[in-house]
Regions:
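Soluble catalytic regions of membrane-associated enzymes that act on cell-envelope
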Residues: 6-298
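Conserved small/polar residues in nucleotide/adenosyl-binding loops
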Residues: 1-5
């Protein structure tokens, strides 16, 4: 992991992160490393603006007043439309198991479901910039590029400027995959990781590979969300449907096997969401919250 991604964990803004990185170690580490990006210019900026511009400015017609609802974004590890019988009923027409996401399928039918929403990233490290900042994937993951410390206007920062509390949850170790560092640079104030979970609930729920099992970590996240000042924005990255595709012993015989090893893990995470909703649906903050579910990559 590039050291600049960790610097933002210890700085209140990206400018101070750059100051942290202005030290002899970083100079020696990067001498001769290259990495310069050649910006080819095939058109003059004015000419290109006349052909196409990626800049879109909001107008009053398409802008609704901010209602101050809480927003929770679940970024789901290795999730795919093919796991859902609601999205792909033809895959399960002649099979005993009707998909591996029955709870998420029920939410799709009760809420808004976007059936043609595609990721152009292939790794978890590319997910948060895309989901929280609308930043596309490049050959080099954005969080490893020098541009990651450039000023950006991303959803958490926009909402924080509107008075929202902001939080990010991931059951992996603090600093893993640059998630926490990126979340901090995107404007998120509160970070919750494996260490925070274990400080309260002990170490029995570590999966032995990546972090805390999804079910107990989602329950913990709900506890922390209940204590956040409203309105709040929270993003949560799940883990349990990642390779090597294991589930807790208590669920080994309770979940469908599927055609591949990850299907049982997907079913486990789906059940973890079901239990999260069952526990917190009666809370006042829950009824004032918009929940968004999105996969991390293709």
């Amino acid at each position: 992991m590039c050291i600049r991604d960790s610097a933002t964990l210890y700085a209140s803004d990206n400018a101070r992160a750059n100051l942290i990185l202005s030290n002899p170690f970083c100079i020696l580490r990067t001498v001769g490393s290259g990495g310069k990006i050649n910006y080819e210019r095939y058109f003059a900026p004015e000419e290109l603006d006349g052909i196409y511009t990626p800049v879109h400015c909001p107008d009053s017609v398409g802008t609704a007043p901010l209602e101050g609802r809480n927003v929770v974004v679940f970024v789901m590890e290795s999730m795919s439309a093919e796991h859902s019988a609601h999205l792909h009923p033809e895959l399960y027409a002649d099979r005993q198991v009707k998909g591996y996401t029955p709870f998420l399928d029920s939410l799709m039918q009760a809420g808004y479901c976007f059936e043609r929403m595609y990721a152009n990233g292939t790794r978890s490290i590319q997910a948060l910039p895309a989901v929280l900042g609308s930043i596309p994937s490049f050959k080099t993951p954005f969080v490893l590029m020098p541009q990651a410390l450039a000023p950006t206007r991303q959803l958490p920062r926009i909402l924080r400027d509107k008075g929202y509390a902001t939080a990010f949850f991931c059951g992996s170790a603090a600093g893993s995959m640059g998630f926490g560092a990126y979340a901090r640079s995107a404007g998120i104030e509160r970070l919750y990781s494996r260490e925070d979970y274990e400080a309260r609930h002990g170490r029995d729920d570590f999966d032995g590979y990546w972090g805390i099992w999804d079910e107990p970590f989602l329950q913990y996240a709900g506890e922390e969300m209940s204590a956040l000042p409203e309105p709040f924005f929270a993003a949560l990255f799940t883990l349990s449907s990642h390779h090597p595709f294991v589930v807790p012993d208590a669920y080994r015989d309770l979940l469908p096997e599927g055609l591949t090893r990850n299907h049982k893990c997907v079913a486990y995470t789906d059940n973890a969401f079901r239990r999260f909703f069952a526990r917190y649906a009666g809370e006042e903050w829950f009824r004032r919250t918009v929940f968004v579910f999105v996969a991390d990559h293709v």
